[in-house]
């Protein structure tokens, strides 16, 4: 076991001290919001129906697709990292066993990709705070449920933010529009 994996497992085991029946229910529910980006896709659909957020929703779609291609179709298969429950014995999962590789966390990548896009466009403090809290909770739930290493989640967050920023930069630079928020 390498140095990073040892540190990851130590952190995961510390997080396990938070376990309780109530937390189990909360974390399984929160992680379900991130399954296949369902919550974010539903949010995009809702935003598409509004005049104020329609433009943002279109960019959310583009950023989401770029993120899925980079993280789920390229990086995960290329790295092929085992999940923590496959390495540490005696872990009882509270959710269905994920079948794809662990690195990076797709839930974290998609959540922070969507959050970055929302923060770029939205002027609503309520939407920004709610999206921030949800993204953070989804990422944390993956650790609590022992399905990702902390380094998977951290890198997922970084990949999510970068995929959004790079996509927005590319989209806006083609149109000659500055990336700065008005």
Please report, for each region that a protein language model flagged, where it lies by residue.
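N-terminal transmembrane-helix/juxtamembrane module of multi-pass inner/ER membrane proteins
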Residues: 1-38, 72-100, 181-182
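Alpha-helical architecture
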Residues: 6, 65, 78, 104-105, ...
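Membrane-interface junctions
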Residues: 17, 32-36, 51, 124, ...
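Membrane-helix interface segments
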Residues: 22-23, 52-57, 123-129
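Hydrophobic, aromatic-rich transmembrane alpha-helices
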Residues: 40-50, 111-119
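Interfacial segments of alpha-helical transmembrane regions
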Residues: 43-69
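Alpha-helical membrane-inserting segments
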Residues: 46, 66, 70, 74-75, ...
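Membrane-embedded catalytic cores of phosphoryl/pyrophosphoryl-handling enzymes
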Residues: 91-182
């Amino acid at each position: 076991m390498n140095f990073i994996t040892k540190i990851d497992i130590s952190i995961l085991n510390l997080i396990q001290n938070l376990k309780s029946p109530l937390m189990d229910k909360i974390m399984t529910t929160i992680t379900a919001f991130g399954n296949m980006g369902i919550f974010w896709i539903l949010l995009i659909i809702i935003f598409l129906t509004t005049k104020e957020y329609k433009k943002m929703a279109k960019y959310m779609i583009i950023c989401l697709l770029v993120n899925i291609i980079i993280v789920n179709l390229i990086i995960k298969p290329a790295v092929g990292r085992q999940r923590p429950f496959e390495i540490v014995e005696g872990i009882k999962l509270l959710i269905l066993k994920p079948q794809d590789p662990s690195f990076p966390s797709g839930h974290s990548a998609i959540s922070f990709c969507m959050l970055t896009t929302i923060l770029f466009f939205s002027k609503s403090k309520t939407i920004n705070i709610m999206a921030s809290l949800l993204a953070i909770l989804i990422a944390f739930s993956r650790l609590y449920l022992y399905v990702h290493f902390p380094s998977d989640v951290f890198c997922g967050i970084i990949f999510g933010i970068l995929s959004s920023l790079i996509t927005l930069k590319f989209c806006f630079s083609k149109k000659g529009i500055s990336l700065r928020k008005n």
